[in-house]
Amino acid sequence: HLDYHHTMEEYRRAKGLLFQQCRKAVLNLDDEAGRWYLDNIPCPAFTYSENKNGADLSARNIRLFPSHVEFEALTLGEISRVHLPIPGGFSIYNALAALAAGLCLGLALEDMARVMPSVHGVKGRVEVVPVPRAYTVLIDYAHSPNALENILSTARDFTAGRLICVFGCGGDRDKTKRP
């Protein structure tokens, strides 16, 4: 959203205003901004992490596949196996954020983990295209250099051989991304 906020500092400040109205925040401890908000917001926080000790919710025994991810979610001594039919390491973070929000609302970890296999991704975001060959085709609307790097990293996680990327610049919202 830098096309609107112009700098990361301005974006962080604007986003921080939202926490003035919250009873509880859900923050990713693996993210620099999440750690910054933890120290700079007025409301209590529920934290999650893929790899930091001390988070309220964490993931372990992570397995990445071309069509899905699997991991164990741990919170307050409770462990639930999660199967999410959306590939990529970032999917683990999205699942942890959703689980953390649900836990804050009083939902049971086991109940949420049970329905995760029925979650479908957003069309055009790490969308697996079925093909009759022994390779994987993904469609992703990677709309920034960082997003393109992330999808290529995701694909590399489960690609043994050659990785081919075809990309274009559709749309015209952010004029700084194309002539």
Name the predicted role of every residue range:
Residues 1-136, 160:
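Acidic, Mg2+-coordinating active-site environments of NTP-dependent enzymes
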Residues 2, 89-90, 143-144, 172-173:
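Glycine-/small-residue-rich active-site loops that bind phosphorylated ligands and cofactors
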Residues 27, 139, 167:
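Active-site flanking residues adjacent to catalytic metal/cofactor-binding acidic residues
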Residues 30, 142, 170:
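Anionic group-transfer/hydrolysis microenvironments
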Residues 122-124, 146-179:
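Active-site beta-alpha connecting loops in nucleotide-dependent enzymes
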